[in-house]
Amino acid sequence: MRNIAIVEDEDSATALLKGYIEKYAEKSGQQFNVVRFKNGVDFLEDYQSTYSVVFMDIQMPQRNGMSVAFDLREIDKTVSIIFVTNLSQYAQKGYEVDAVGYLMKPVSYYDFELKFRKALDVYAMNEEQKITITVAGGFCRISTLLLFVTVICV
């Protein structure tokens, strides 16, 4: 089961995305656990590196989603980010945080499915290069590219 975060202050936009995720799950036979955050501050405070995809609104109270995405990249370089907004002027900036996609509201299912499938594929490719270990208080994902193995022969 993959964990999906929706960072969105509008209830109607959240309901639409959840419905699309459920529809995609039915069509693909995959299972998703969806967690919603009403603002970016709560999202970052509660963030755990267990999300595969983050749907991020840009225009939100307290902090805009673009600045939240920059902070997210400081703690998780592999999670797939999809911006969902009605502000097209931020599309170019999304490349700076390696966003997988940019969906304009109101979101059509066709556009959603294309971006969501791509986000899952990108995340899966990144995950193939990581291992998960148990640490005090939870789990930690480590890139296998950063691991050095020491073999001691007696």
Give each language-model segment a name:
Residues M1-N3:
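Non-catalytic signal-transmission and effector/linker regions of two-component phosphorelay proteins
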Residues E8:
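Conserved acidic carboxylate
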Residues D11-V35, E74:
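Two-component/phosphorelay signaling modules centered on CheY-like receiver
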Residues R117-V154:
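Conserved binding/recognition cores within well-folded domains
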Residues Q30, K77, Q129:
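Residue-level signal for beta-strand positions within conserved beta-sheet cores that form or flank
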Residues N33-V53:
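Acidic, metal-coordinating helix/loop segments flanking the phosphotransfer/catalytic sites
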Residues E45, Y51-N126:
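CheY-like receiver
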